[in-house]
Design a protein with these regions (language model features):
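Short Lys/Arg-rich cationic patches that frequently serve as NLS/NoLS or arginine-rich RNA/DNA-binding motifs
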Residues: 2-21
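Acidic, small-residue rich beta-repeat scaffolds with periodic aromatic anchors
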Residues: 55, 176-188
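Alpha-helical solenoid scaffolds in large eukaryotic transport, assembly, and signaling factors
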Residues: 59-178
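Cysteine-cluster motifs in flexible loop/terminal segments that predominantly coordinate metals
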Residues: 20-46, 53, 57
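Short linear motifs centered on Gly/Pro in flexible linkers and helix caps
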Residues: 1-2, 20, 31, 99
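A generic structural signal for solvent-exposed, polar alpha-helical segments
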Residues: 40, 53-54, 82, 172, ...
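Polar low-complexity intrinsically disordered regions enriched in Ser/Thr and small residues
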Residues: 13, 21-23, 39, 43, ...
């Protein structure tokens, strides 16, 4: 499903064909690559009534003592499962990934790749593409385009997600590579 003129697609939350739970994607980055990546943008813990929750680690840690990429990617994908409004309980994950886009582009791309694999609906794939993936490419175009092209070759689902990316200020050469990797016709 490709976004068209920013109109909501007809099948907003249709389960993807070949259903069943998505396979658990393996994180490709070593554990040390996640050191210092936590954005600290979790909702303030002090609004919780429960003192134990208020003192808990950031949400992206899950049940571990460090950022858990699988937990973050799964929560990020599930945040878009409810359609255009998403899921408020999981909105923190989208904010976390968006913060990563600016300071940790390689980590952000890995979370996006994993979230696409966890996605269960066309709508989730669309929102990830026209959201954080588009922002990431717009900000770090030449730094990550090679990895993006590789992921598009490896995964039809990632390629479909990439088809939802708009130009967002990318230079001509990078934009042509995005178009080609997503199966669209380059401009030249």
């Amino acid at each position: 499903m490709v976004r068209s003129n920013d109109q909501r697609p007809e099948r907003s939350a249709k389960p993807r064909s070949g259903s069943g739970a998505p396979a658990d994607p393996q994180c490709r980055l070593p554990a040390e690559a996640w050191d210092g990546v936590c954005c600290g943008a979790c909702p303030d813990h002090d609004w919780w009534d429960d003192d134990e929750v208020a003192a808990s680690p950031p949400f992206c840690f899950g049940t571990s003592r460090a950022l858990d990429p699988a937990h973050l990617a799964r929560t990020y994908a599930l945040g878009y499962k409810g359609g255009i409004k998403g899921n408020e309980e999981r909105a923190w994950a989208s904010r976390c990934v968006f913060a990563m886009v600016y300071d940790h582009p390689v980590a952000a791309l890995e979370i996006i790749r994993m979230a696409i694999a966890y996605s269960e609906t066309d709508w989730q794939v669309t929102l990830i593409g026209c959201g954080e993936l588009e922002s990431l490419l717009g900000r770090h175009d030449r730094k990550i385009i090679g990895a993006v092209e590789q992921m598009a070759r490896e995964s039809p689902k990632f390629r479909e997600c990439l088809a939802n990316v708009w130009r967002h200020g990318m230079p001509d050469d990078v934009w042509d590579r995005v178009l080609a990797a997503s199966g669209r016709k380059p401009t030249a």
